[in-house]
């Protein structure tokens, strides 16, 4: 792709978004997908896979803080964390901020994503790949969760949309495998698209996850890069109390962890589980 052109996202047929390409840093096909990293004056460095924006330097902190701190602080004493996907390293960066976590395993199907993001998105990983608690596994996420002998307290599915390599991370086989290697009282979370435009994804995930977990729901965050409204995150656990912890408990855990965030705070944590009525109605109609 030439510089000083417009890059158009291809996720939706009838509408979408575009970014001015000021400088192409990398554009190649990896073993699994088309990967481009370019610079944009408004959003900094932008990474897209197969024509869909995955992350930008300007607003990635919202996504990664919410995917990480909500489940980890709700759990309260997570020692072992599994990240599925997350090759840009930002999810890992946020998990490493929790000093009580003892092991962090990241399973990424595409070694190319990890390699090129380390080089071209250094602010995302911020050196977290060198954390001694971290182990990288290059494997398919479904295969890993169904074969591993490890167990985890929190599983974060930092998946792409349910197309291409990411499609398998929205299947019953994946959810069943996650339940299999999740410790009692553990929490599973996953990105679940922009529910106003991708409502069927949320409905499908809710239906499938409900076969394996007693408490299934969603929480949300407004992330400008993800076109169409508020990003939805799936939540699943067998500890029904964790989604309804008091603000005092979350506040105490937040301060004990010593976190300083740019988006997440205990009030946001509680508010994130308030869902729009159209999503309640859609889930009730299943």
Curated annotation (Swiss-Prot):
EC number: 2.5.1.16
A GO molecular-function descriptor: spermidine synthase activity
Broad class of where this protein is predominantly found: cytoplasm
Catalytic activity, as annotated: S-adenosyl 3-(methylsulfanyl)propylamine + putrescine = S-methyl-5'-thioadenosine + spermidine + H(+)
InterPro entries: PABS (IPR030374), PABS_CS (IPR030373), SAM-dependent_MTases_sf (IPR029063), Spermi_synthase (IPR001045), Spermidine_synt_N (IPR035246), Spermidine_synt_N_sf (IPR037163)
Amino-acid positions noted as binding S-methyl-5'-thioadenosine in the UniProt annotation, renumbered to this chain: 33, 108, 140-141, 165
One GO BP annotation of this record: spermidine biosynthetic process
Alphabetical keyword list: Cytoplasm, Polyamine biosynthesis, Spermidine biosynthesis, Transferase
Assigned GO CC terms: cytosol
Entry-linked Pfam families: Spermine_synt_N, Spermine_synth
Pathway participation: Amine and polyamine biosynthesis; spermidine biosynthesis; spermidine from putrescine: step 1/1
Task performed by this protein: Catalyzes the irreversible transfer of a propylamine group from the amino donor S-adenosylmethioninamine (decarboxy-AdoMet) to putrescine (1,4-diaminobutane) to yield spermidine.
Subunit structure: Homodimer or homotetramer.
Protein family according to the UniProt entry: Belongs to the spermidine/spermine synthase family.
Name of the protein this chain belongs to: Polyamine aminopropyltransferase
Gene that this sequence comes from: speE
